Amino acid sequence: MASNSSSCPTPGGGHLNGYPVPPYAFFFPPMLGGLSPPGALTTLQHQLPVSGYSTPSPATIETQSSSSEEIVPSPPSPPPLPRIYKPCFVCQDKSSGYHYGVSACEGCKGFFRRSIQKNMVYTCHRDKNCIINKVTRNRCQYCRLQKCFEVGMSKESVRNDRNKKKKEVPKPECSESYTLTPEVGELIEKVRKAHQETFPALCQLGKYTTNNSSEQRVSLDIDLWDKFSELSTKCIIKTVEFAKQLPGFTTLTIADQITLLKAACLDILILRICTRYTPEQDTMTFSDGLTLNRTQMHNAGFGPLTDLVFAFANQLLPLEMDDAETGLLSAICLICGDRQDLEQPDRVDMLQEPLLEALKVYVRKRRPSRPHMFPKMLMKITDLRSISAKGAERVITLKMEIPGSMPPLIQEMLENSEGLDTLSGQPGGGGRDGGGLAPPPGSCSPSLSPSSNRSSPATHSP
C-alpha cells in the first residue's frame, strides 16, 4: 500500500486523476480543484496493454498519460476581468485607482500630493463647508484638502511614497558640484534678461521725491493714490511682458496663462518694489524714480499693508539677491502648479522644475559657503503669498475709499481673486456693476491675456 501511494500522480507531476494538466498548473486554479469525468480512468485502462495483470500499475498509467499530453491541448487562459473602482471619494469623478488609502481620480491624487509635499496652507473665503464635486473641486482648495482628509487620504502615505522614491533613486547631495551646465546657464540668462528689460535696477533710476503727506499718516492721500495707481498699472504691464519672455510660458493654454498672471501679479509687484528699498532713508523707489517714505507709502494706498511690506523688504536685505535671483524667484512665483483653477497643473509643475533647479545651482555656486540660502529664498514665496492675500483684502477697502473707479488693469488683475467675488455688483466705491469696467477709449494698457484679440478686460473671465 505504501508503494502505491508514493507513485500516485500529483498536480506537481503534471497530471490529476489520470488527466493531463498544463505545464503551468498555477495559471488555472479552477482545473486543480475539479473532478475527472466518470469512466475516464476505465477508458484509459482499456487503451493500455495487458501484461498479466487485470489492473495496470499506477506507474504504467503515468507513462501512458504522459504520452497523451501532446494530444490533449490546454484550455486557453480566460482574459482578466477589468478592475472596476468606486468613483473618486473626494469629487465623485472617475477613479484611476486607490491612492493614499482611498479610491481617487488623478486630479485629486495630484492635488493632495502637492499640498502635502509643499506644506500648502489654504484659506476658505466662505464658511469652510464648500461643496466639492467634479465641477466645483477647483474653486476652494481649503475645502478640497479637508475633504481629502475626511474621506481618509493619508499624509503618511505621501511621505512614505516620497521616501520610497528617494531610496530607489538615491541622490548623492554631498557630491553635487553645482556646475552650471550650458542648458541651465542659458535658462538663467533668459530669465535675467527678461527681468532687467522689464524692471530697471535702483542704480539706473533718477530719484525724485514729493512733499505730499510725508509727515503724518492719513487714510488716503488722493494725489498720491492717483500717482501710485498710474505707476501700478505700468508695473502690471511690465510684469505681463516679463511672463511672456519666460521659457515655456506662452506654450501653456491661454486660460492657464491668465490664471497664473492674476494669481502671482501681486506677489511679483511686492517682490520687485521691495528690492528697491533703501534702509538708510526707509524709502522705496518706483520705476519712474518716484521715491516715497513709509508714511507716504501708507497714504498712497498701502494702508495697513505698509509695515508688512517694509518688514519683508528688510528681510530681503541679508539675502543680497542679484537680478538673476530676483528674476528666477519671480518666475517660480508665477509658474506654480498649485494655483487655483488651472487646466494643466502638472504641465505647469514641469515648467517650474528647471527654474527651481536653476535657482538652486546659481545660488549655491554664488555662495558656496552658505548652502542654506537657497531654501531661505524659497521660503520668501510663502511670505509673499501671505502679504498678497492681505493686499487683495486691501484692494477691497480701497474700492470703497477712492472717489472714482479702480483703474481697469488693476481691476482685471484682481477680477477673479479670492475674496473679491463678494464685491460683484455692489454699488459705491467704484465696485463692478454687473457689466464690469471697460478700459477707457484709446487706452493702450494691454489686458492680462497674452493674446492680442482679447475683448475688454471686464467682459472676459477665464
From Swiss-Prot:
Changing residue 166 to R: Cytoplasmic in the absence of ATRA and reduced transcriptional activity in the presence of ATRA. Low sumoylation levels in the presence of ATRA. Nuclear localization and enhanced transcriptional activity. GO terms for biological process: apoptotic cell clearance; cell differentiation; cellular response to estrogen stimulus; cellular response to lipopolysaccharide; cellular response to retinoic acid; chondroblast differentiation; embryonic camera-type eye development; face development. Induction: Expression is induced ba retinoic acid. Down-regulated by aging. Induced by pulsatile shear stress. Residues 52-77, 419-462 are annotated as: Disordered. Residues 52-64 have a biased composition (Polar residues). One of its GO terms (molecular function) is DNA-binding transcription factor activity. Residues 183-417 form the NR LBD domain. Residues 1-87 are annotated as: Modulating. Signal peptide: none annotated. Disulfide bonds: none annotated. One of its GO terms (cellular component) is cytoplasm. Expressed in monocytes. Changing residue 254 to A: Reduced ubiquitination and degradation by UBR5. A zinc finger (NR C4-type) spans 88-108, 124-148. Pfam families: Hormone_recep, zf-C4. SUPFAM superfamilies: Glucocorticoid receptor-like (DNA-binding domain) (SSF57716), Nuclear receptor ligand-binding domain (SSF48508). Composed of three domains: a modulating N-terminal domain, a DNA-binding domain and a C-terminal ligand-binding domain. The 9aaTAD motif is a transactivation domain present in a large number of yeast and animal transcription factors. It is linked to Chromosomal aberrations involving RARA are commonly found in acute promyelocytic leukemia. Translocation t(11;17)(q32;q21) with ZBTB16/PLZF; translocation t(15;17)(q21;q21) with PML; translocation t(5;17)(q32;q11) with NPM. The PML-RARA oncoprotein requires both the PML ring structure and coiled-coil domain for both interaction with UBE2I, nuclear microspeckle location and sumoylation. In addition, the coiled-coil domain functions in blocking RA-mediated transactivation and cell differentiation. Receptor for retinoic acid. Retinoic acid receptors bind as heterodimers to their target response elements in response to their ligands, all-trans or 9-cis retinoic acid, and regulate gene expression in various biological processes. The RXR/RAR heterodimers bind to the retinoic acid response elements (RARE) composed of tandem 5'-AGGTCA-3' sites known as DR1-DR5. In the absence of ligand, the RXR-RAR heterodimers associate with a multiprotein complex containing transcription corepressors that induce histone deacetylation, chromatin condensation and transcriptional suppression. This is Retinoic acid receptor alpha. It comes from Homo sapiens (Human). The gene is RARA.
